[in-house]
């Protein structure tokens, strides 16, 4: 980089020998005083330019006429020449200033008109996409050329050099007067420069800059797409074809990245390149971006599968060494920029919002009368819709990135990396011991569904915390406590543990209580909404029951769908407790619970056998409030089966007992518990298994039951067997999440399976 001004040392030792000779001849040919006056004129003119451009946001270099004639390398290597220079930093660009002093009172300064012309002629430096583009006008050079070249060289001298000029002590007050003049002239120059700069920012030049930025970022984006498509995807597919892992997994990770890459590299980028070459005759980009709209569907498919793709990369990296080896080898290359595969996979998600941002800026600078206005506006409307989906995926990715950081801080012991987990708050806190009330340092991570209570781990490398307790939000209560000895305390009471904590200040305490309470309320609201939706579908409220019951024939529950009375929950047997149907609600009940008769409107008002609940509603007889709230169509197993993560018949064996066929359900509202029923319509579960903490063994031990798996915890052993491998994998997918405290966030597919079955008797899986 060239120096803006020469150092204020003697130019006789720095300039070329020819310049020195000319300068000496110039002074020998006339009086010293007249030469000095000419010198001061040029010096004053040169002085005004850096003074004007020393403002923030403006950068300049002096006219070429005043630049030193020796090489830049010599300037950098010579320590004497750098003395006395002052660099001002303005928007990342250094503008050098060289302050010179003048002594002669007879010296004439620049007129305001010439100062304005000089300031306006200063070059503007703009930073665009990391590159500097400088436009230097010739006005400053023309001003410099109007004076003698030798005088410009001699202006390098400072007062008091060996030319015998008057000393600066001989002219008191001259510096102040000259500075005053310079300030007045430079103020006018600044105003004119700002106006000139403003005019430039509002014309088509700014539109050209936006289009240029679009082109440059598109080039960088295509290179990232090529990295994903031609490097990561191809290398992993080659490894998959060797049999290291299924090629289907690679296709799921990269989705339609090849199609996206082909569109941008073969169509959009060449179109932008061509348009920028023809910008003088066709200054528009809206028509090109409008052609992008039909191809946004490709991004919709990519965004839709992004969460699963990132999760699959994590799983494959942990479980398949060959996959991990290939990805790490590529990530070490310079082209990756020390970023992981997951970071590069985010590039297509981030690109659509980038188009939206550039188009918005483009429309702000574009005149409504422009022929490109309609195309640009229509493009923005279409791209904005796609950008909203991309922004949602970006937020999820940022959340997932934060979860990965916490996962590493916890020593990779707590499997919290799940898109359904959202970090609400984290921070240091003190825990009051129950025995001696001493305060102990702890760290909390609050998520939308749990609280991690951690202890600091003192180690030089690796994890920072150890999880002491995982407290679920479900059932959690917050109590503000008052302790005179320990202020700012509050209590967290959960199913797993109760903690008395001390915040650092009253504000910190209020923030924690607020965050915890909002998380609890949001959790209950989600589950309450879910339960209300189930109640509307499966239960008949009292008012509706009174109006509808007996007026419409019910659907009878099949006998083989229950093993116990749906009212008193007593088991059926062939001799003493047989099955009966209530003609009003269709439930299967025992003889004790069906020993009632009521007139049913749909049967012409004839008396029919009904259950006790239906009799109470039809006849108007009321029982206790508790029985009222139960409802007459409450079917426990059917309720959870119809809204479950997975449900089907499985073979079950506990310890050395024989295998038996049972109906198993993991409900959505309680996804960490496995419910086991005798039949799909039973109102009471035979047993439940809290899955959290169990160890899953999916290796079959028996040739007779090849699709079996086992759950083990301490001395408890539960063995299950599915009818086929597909059903087994569906169960294992949900159970493997549940044993680590995680819940599936995607919609379950069992409802579609149920809808395709001809009748309730064939509820083999869901």
UniProtKB/Swiss-Prot annotation:
Organism classification: Eukaryota, Metazoa, Chordata, Craniata, Vertebrata
Domain DH: 206-393
Name by which UniProt lists this protein: FYVE, RhoGEF and PH domain-containing protein 4
Domain of life: Eukaryota
Expression by tissue: Detected in thymus, lung, heart, skeletal muscle, small intestine, liver, kidney, spleen and testis. Expressed in all parts of the brain and in the spinal cord at embryonic, postnatal, and adult stages. Levels of expression are lower in postnatal and adult tissues than in embryonic tissues.
Record text about domains: The part of the protein spanning the actin filament-binding domain together with the DH domain and the first PH domain is necessary and sufficient for microspike formation. Activation of MAPK8 requires the presence of all domains with the exception of the actin filament-binding domain.
Cellular component, GO, one term: cytoplasm
Entry's Gene Ontology molecular function annotations: actin binding; guanyl-nucleotide exchange factor activity; zinc ion binding
Biased composition annotated in UniProt, kind: Polar residues: 47-62, 70-85
Gene: Fgd4
Annotated Zn(2+) 1 binding sites: 565, 568, 590, 593
Phosphoserine sites (modified residues): 702, 716
């Amino acid at each position: 980089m060239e120096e803006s001004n020469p150092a204020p040392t003697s130019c006789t030792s720095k300039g070329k020998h020819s310049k020195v000779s000319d300068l000496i001849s110039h002074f020998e040919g006339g009086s010293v005083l007249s030469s000095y006056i000419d010198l001061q004129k040029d010096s004053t003119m040169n002085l005004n330019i850096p003074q004007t451009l020393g403002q923030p946001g403006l950068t300049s270099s002096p006219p070429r006429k005043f630049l030193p004639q020796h090489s830049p390398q010599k300037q950098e290597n010579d320590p004497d020449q750098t003395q006395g220079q002052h660099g001002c930093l303005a928007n990342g660009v250094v503008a050098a200033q060289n302050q010179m002093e003048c002594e002669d009172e007879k010296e004439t300064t620049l007129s305001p008109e010439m100062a304005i012309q000089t300031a306006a002629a200063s070059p503007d430096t703009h930073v665009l996409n990391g590159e500097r583009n400088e436009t230097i006008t010739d006005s400053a050079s023309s001003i410099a050329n109007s004076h003698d070249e030798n005088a410009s060289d001699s202006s390098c001298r400072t007062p008091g050099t060996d030319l015998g000029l008057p000393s600066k002590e001989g002219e008191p007050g001259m510096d102040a007067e000259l500075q005053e003049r310079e300030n007045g002239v430079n103020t006018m120059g600044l105003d004119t420069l700002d106006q000139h700069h403003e005019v430039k920012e509002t014309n088509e030049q700014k539109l050209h800059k936006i289009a240029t930025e679009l082109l440059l970022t598109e080039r960088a984006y295509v290179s990232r797409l090529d990295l994903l498509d031609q490097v990561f995807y191809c290398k992993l597919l080659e490894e998959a074809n060797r049999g290291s892992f299924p090629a289907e997994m690679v296709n799921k990770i990269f989705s339609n990245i090849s199609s996206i890459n082909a569109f941008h590299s073969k169509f959009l980028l060449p179109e932008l390149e061509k348009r920028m070459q023809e910008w003088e005759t066709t200054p528009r980009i809206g028509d090109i971006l409008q052609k992008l709209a039909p191809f946004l569907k490709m991004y919709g498919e990519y965004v839709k599968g992004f969460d699963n793709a990132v999760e699959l990369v994590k799983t494959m990296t942990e479980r398949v060494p060959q996959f991990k080896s290939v990805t790490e080898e590529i990530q070490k290359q310079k082209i990756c920029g020390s970023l992981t595969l997951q970071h590069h996979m985010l590039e297509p998600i981030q690109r659509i919002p980038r188009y939206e941002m550039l188009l918005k800026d483009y429309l702000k600078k574009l005149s409504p009368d422009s022929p490109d206005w309609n195309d640009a506006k229509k493009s923005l409307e279409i791209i904005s819709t796609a950008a909203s989906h991309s922004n949602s995926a970006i937020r999820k990715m940022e959340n997932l990135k934060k979860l990965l950081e916490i996962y590493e801080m916890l020593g990779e012991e707590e499997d919290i990396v799940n898109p359904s987990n959202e970090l609400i708050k984290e921070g240091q806190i003190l825990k009051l011991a129950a025995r001696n009330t001493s305060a102990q340092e702890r760290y909390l991570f609050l998520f939308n569904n749990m609280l991690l209570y951690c202890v600091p781990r003192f180690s030089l490398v690796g994890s920072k915390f150890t999880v002491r307790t995982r407290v679920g939000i479900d059932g959690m209560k917050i109590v503000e406590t008052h302790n005179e000895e320990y202020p700012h305390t509050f209590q967290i009471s959960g199913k797993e543990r109760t903690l008395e904590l001390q915040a650092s200040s009253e504000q910190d305490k209020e923030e924690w209580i607020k965050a915890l309470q909002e998380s609890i309320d949001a959790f209950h609201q989600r589950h309450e909404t879910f339960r209300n939706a189930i109640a509307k579908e499966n239960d008949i409220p009292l008012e509706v029951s009174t109006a509808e019951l007996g007026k419409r024939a019910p659907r009878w529950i099949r006998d083989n769908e229950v093993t116990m009375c749906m009212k008193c929950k007593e088991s059926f047997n062939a001799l003493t407790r047989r099955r009966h149907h209530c003609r009003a609600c269709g439930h299967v009940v025992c003889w004790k619970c069906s020993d009632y008769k009521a007139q049913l409107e749909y049967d012409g008002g004839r008396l029919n056998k009904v259950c006790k609940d239906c009799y109470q509603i039809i006849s108007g007889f009321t029982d206790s409030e508790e029985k009222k709230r139960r409802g007459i169509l409450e079917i426990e197993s059917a309720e959870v089966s119809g809204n479950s993560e997975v449900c089907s018949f499985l073979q079950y064996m506990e310890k050395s007992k024989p295998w038996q066929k049972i109906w198993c359900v993991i409900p959505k509202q309680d996804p960490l518990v496995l419910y086991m029923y005798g039949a799909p319509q039973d109102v009471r579960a035979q047993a439940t298994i809290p899955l959290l903490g169990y160890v899953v063994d999916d290796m079959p031990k028996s040739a007779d039951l090849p699709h079996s798996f086992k759950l083990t915890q301490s001395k408890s052993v539960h063995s299950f067997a599915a009818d086929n491998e597909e059903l087994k994998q569906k169960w294992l997918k949900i159970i493997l999440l549940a044993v680590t405290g995680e819940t599936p966030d995607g919609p379950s597919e069992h409802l579609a399976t149920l809808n395709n079955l001809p009748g309730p008797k064939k509820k083999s899986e869901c």
